[in-house]
């Protein structure tokens, strides 16, 4: 139990901070990518980052299509590959607005604000921790998109080593599924389609036999009545 006057050492978890930085900076790229793909009606409705993932809530009226998600993901990864320097500047609110920096809707700001810029692609009011260059994010992968309230969607995504771990896990599951189906990853889809066709044929044959048996049973009953 600590008491007044006790000394303590304070240190930053560098590894956790680095992962959180990647997720936070990726979220800035994500918001701009969403506005490019879906429209400028997209605004932040909530945001959370830790060392594992980023979670971003935004205004939108419908579930995103697979094609839209793919476009957004590609834009973010393209900006990561461009190795854009991440710059921070402190300026007055009026100066920040003149730069075109995005502010959080409904948020009240003081006389000065911090603006985080990623080239000409993304500029936002932000006081959080970030990478120094988008290349540090390494990779970006959307893992889910769903609704959380009327007119509000949520995206969860991974960055860096967590993306590679995600794909390694998918590969492991694919190999296990292929083994169970006595196929290879390359032939798994074909094998599943073949199995589905067999099941459909057997189901149809079973229904036909049941119908035939029912008719025969009915015939026996009618014979007994006669």
Language-model features: locations:
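Non-catalytic interaction/regulatory segments
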Residues: 55-148
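Histidine-centered catalytic micro-motifs
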Residues: 22-35, 125-133
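Short pre-active-site segment immediately N-terminal to the catalytic Zn-binding motif
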Residues: 14-24
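Terminal appendage regions of diverse proteins
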Residues: 41, 51, 134-226
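Short, conserved phosphate-binding/catalytic loop or strand-edge motifs used
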Residues: 48-55
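Conserved nucleotide-binding/hydrolysis modules and their immediate coupling elements
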Residues: 1-11, 15
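Active-site palm subdomain of RNA-directed nucleic acid polymerases
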Residues: 33-46
């Amino acid at each position: 139990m600590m008491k007044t006057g006790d000394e303590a050492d304070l240190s930053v978890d560098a590894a956790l901070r680095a992962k959180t930085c990647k997720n936070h900076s990726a979220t800035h790229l994500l918001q701009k990518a969403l506005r490019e793909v879906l429209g400028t009606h997209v605004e932040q409705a909530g945001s959370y980052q830790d060392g594992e993932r980023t979670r971003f809530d935004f205004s939108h009226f419908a579930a995103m299509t697979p094609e839209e998600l793919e476009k957004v993901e590609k834009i973010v990864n393209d900006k990561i590959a461009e190795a854009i320097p991440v710059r921070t500047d402190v300026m007055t609110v009026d100066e920040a607005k003149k730069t075109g920096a995005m502010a959080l809707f409904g948020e009240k700001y003081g006389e000065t604000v911090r603006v985080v810029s990623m080239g000409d692609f993304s500029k936002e009011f932000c006081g959080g921790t970030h990478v120094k260059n988008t290349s540090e994010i390494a990779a970006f992968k959307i893992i889910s998109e769903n609704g959380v309230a009327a007119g509000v969607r949520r995206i969860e995504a991974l960055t860096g080593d967590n993306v590679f771990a995600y794909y390694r896990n998918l590969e492991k599951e694919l190999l296990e599924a292929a083994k169970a189906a006595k196929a290879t990853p390359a032939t798994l889809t074909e094998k599943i389609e073949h199995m589905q066709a067999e099941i459909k044929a057997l189901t149809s044959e079973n229904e036909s036999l049941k119908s035939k048996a029912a008719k025969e049973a009915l015939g026996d009953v009618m014979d007994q009545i006669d």
